[in-house]
Amino acid sequence: MLNHILLLVISLVCAALTLSWFPLLFRKQSYSCAKGLIVITGGSGILGHAIIQEALDRGFSVASLDSTEPASFLQYNSKFSALKCNITKDKDVEGCVHSLKKMNRTPFALINAAAIAPKNHLLSISRQELQKCFETNVIGQLAITSALFPLLLQDPNPHVVNIASSLAYFSAMGVGAYSSSKAALVSLHETLEEEVLSQHPNFKFSLYVLGQIKSTMFEKDTPNRVLAPLLEPQNLAKIIIQNLYTNKSGRFYYPFYARFMPLLRFFPLPIQKLARLFSGMDKIYS
């Protein structure tokens, strides 16, 4: 019991220090990655599309790995390449890596923006839906990261970007599959970062923990615009690309409330219930 209390105290202190010294979590160097190649998954999504457009506007080259066709106007941009790829299928992943090698394209950054969010209660969701969610949001992202890893290492400052959700820390009714997959992604990111940096200290990892984005993935509005404002995908894209441009990495939380979501887990259950009631988070997809 004493060990559990000590662990709780240490966790709270670490969380407080994280919030107090938040700016120190970022590693920034003078190296600029302008004109390099960015590989992105999920480019047909609202956020993925915004990231592609912002990257092209900033002078980067972009290779989009997606199972659907890109917007027609992107196909006429000489710096844009579209590779049809389902990241949940090993053959597709291997084929995309082979195509990049064949084109003599070496990426400096990978942005994992692919995600799906089934809406169903956990006792009602099918095994197939749950499996597809984890394959897309977790397993597939690790697969493409692993496959591109040798190519990324050819750049002096390689960078992997993963996009999580504030729901990974405090889930809501009706989106349990999505939330748990994003929680797994957070754990995967943290472990992968430590494993890679132990051997390749120049490698960069960035984790973006986001609230609700204006997109078709979560078409229903948030119940409390003051506490949980909707995020504009274009604004997020500017932040992500700017951080790549300046070689800044670390943990990024948007909007402001997202950085406090992990702390809710340490509060007594009645307080958590009040937070759910006050925010209305369980009413959206219940």
Curated annotation (Swiss-Prot):
Q: How does it sit in the membrane?
A: Multi-pass membrane protein
Quote the cellular component terms of the Gene Ontology held in the record: endoplasmic reticulum; endoplasmic reticulum membrane; mitochondrion
Q: Does the keyword Membrane apply?
A: yes
Signal peptide start-end: none
Residues that coordinate or bind NADP(+)? 47, 67, 178, 182, 213, 215
The main location is: endoplasmic reticulum
Species of origin: Schizosaccharomyces pombe (strain 972 / ATCC 24843) (Fission yeast)
Q: Where are the transmembrane segments?
A: 5-25, 36-56
Which terms are listed as keywords in the entry?
Endoplasmic reticulum, Membrane, NADP, Oxidoreductase, Transmembrane, Transmembrane helix
Q: What is this protein called?
A: Uncharacterized oxidoreductase C16H5.14c
Catalytic machinery residues: 166 (proton donor), 178 (proton donor), 182 (lowers pka of active site tyr)
